[in-house]
Amino acid sequence: MQQDKVNLLGLNQKAIEDFFISIGEKKFHARQVFKWIHKKGVIDFDAMTDLGKNLRHKLKEKAQITIPKVVFSKASKDGTHKWLIDVGGSAVETVFILEEGRGTLCVSSQVGCTLNCSFCSTGKQGFNRNLSAAEVIAQLWIAARTLSKTDGEHDFTVTNIVMMGMGEPLMNFENVVPAMDIMMDDLAYGLSRRKVTLSTSGVVPRIYDLLEQSGVSLAVSLHAPNDMLRNEIVPINKKYNIDELLEACKLYAQKGPHKHITFEYTLMEEVNDNLSDAEELVALLKSREVPAKINLIPFNPYPGTPYKKPSNNRIHRFKEFLQHNGFVTTVRKTRGDDIDAACGQLAGDVMDKTNRKQRYLKKLGDTNAN
């Protein structure tokens, strides 16, 4: 029985070294191949010119470098790029956001999501499966290769990664951490821990694991100033409440790459954007002594949602109150909304699973026919 070939794309440096040892080759050859794949974007063993002929032949027998197919890509007028990537009959989305002095890639970790936050369009898809480490890092590989070919009017270099795409990354810990290792490896993409941010809705035990095993920057999707409201809109709060979450955040801030935690707070009109909510949020964070930066995200409506985006006046009032009480507070600018790439739109049109599957397969068929 023929053994399945190992996909080298998702192996971090230690794992690829272990693989090379297992086939009787030296570690330094593993590092050569690792660099070819990620630093140079080469996935054909025959094009790896510093490898011997016998090694190239052995690799073709025992390994492969498989990149998922891009079903389609879009570019926004503001420099945002979006890719729909085929992951074996399902699809995930990856978004590049261009800002002054930085280029941020928003990476997905799951097909769908298990957490079903009430305001999130991705959660309405249900959950299909976790992405493999190869499928996670492939999003950066594809973006880096594509953006390097873009015309020279803008600098489309990926300088930052945010694990904020489809899915809850800490529910796919075993695959996300090796992928982030590759992102931060100097032989690959060379990003620092400060430039790679993982966003979680609050899988508390895994926050401690993340600090121990990776230590990337941490962002927390808080969205509510108390357990009663958070139980309603972020259901995982029923398992890990705000007290438990903030205790983990406090330790992470002490030992992580930043001396603060970024809290994401999606503003929804008359749900969590009242001045009383801002007052409660300030009291909460101060009482728990968590060094905090707050990122306010105006809600992006999608079909069928009961929630509304607040007025600019309500957003400004909320922000001003937080700033007046000593918190660094930003309001996320809407980018890529002309290509459905703005925050909260990663699921595209929210439809039932059957129609969504049919729409995806039609898009894939149309692409293959071209």
UniProtKB/Swiss-Prot annotation:
Tell me which residues make up the Radical SAM core domain.
99-337
Which reaction(s) are listed as its catalytic activity?
A: adenosine(2503) in 23S rRNA + 2 reduced [2Fe-2S]-[ferredoxin] + 2 S-adenosyl-L-methionine = 2-methyladenosine(2503) in 23S rRNA + 5'-deoxyadenosine + L-methionine + 2 oxidized [2Fe-2S]-[ferredoxin] + S-adenosyl-L-homocysteine; adenosine(37) in tRNA + 2 reduced [2Fe-2S]-[ferredoxin] + 2 S-adenosyl-L-methionine = 2-methyladenosine(37) in tRNA + 5'-deoxyadenosine + L-methionine + 2 oxidized [2Fe-2S]-[ferredoxin] + S-adenosyl-L-homocysteine
Q: Keyword set for this entry?
A: 4Fe-4S, Cytoplasm, Disulfide bond, Iron, Iron-sulfur, Metal-binding, Methyltransferase, rRNA processing, S-adenosyl-L-methionine, Transferase, tRNA processing
Top-level taxon of the source organism: Bacteria
Q: Where is the active site?
A: 93, 343
Where's it found, cell-wise?
Answer: Cytoplasm
- One cellular component GO annotation, for this chain's record? cytoplasm
Q: Does this UniProt record's set of keywords contain Membrane?
A: no
Residue sites binding [4Fe-4S] cluster per the record: 113, 117, 120
Identify the InterPro entries for this entry. Aldolase_TIM, Elp3/MiaA/NifB-like_rSAM, Methyltransferase_A, RlmN_N, RNA_MTrfase_RlmN, rRNA_lsu_MTrfase_RlmN/Cfr, rSAM
EC numbers: 2.1.1.192
Task: Name the coenzymes or cofactors required.
Answer: [4Fe-4S] cluster
UniProt keyword Cytoplasm, yes or no: yes
Give each disulfide bond as a residue pair.
106-343
Any one GO molecular function term: tRNA binding
Q: For this protein, what does the record note about how its cofactor is bound?
A: Binds 1 [4Fe-4S] cluster. The cluster is coordinated with 3 cysteines and an exchangeable S-adenosyl-L-methionine.
One GO BP annotation is: tRNA methylation
Instruction: Write down the top EC class of this protein.
Output: transferase
Instruction: Write out the residues that bind S-adenosyl-L-methionine.
Output: 167-168, 199, 221-223, 300
Entries under NCBIfam families matching the protein: rRNA_mod_RlmN
Q: State any further remark.
A: Reaction proceeds by a ping-pong mechanism involving intermediate methylation of a conserved cysteine residue.
The family annotation for this protein states:
Belongs to the radical SAM superfamily. RlmN family.
Q: What does this protein do?
A: Specifically methylates position 2 of adenine 2503 in 23S rRNA and position 2 of adenine 37 in tRNAs. m2A2503 modification seems to play a crucial role in the proofreading step occurring at the peptidyl transferase center and thus would serve to optimize ribosomal fidelity.
Name of protein: Dual-specificity RNA methyltransferase RlmN
| Protein encoded by which gene | rlmN
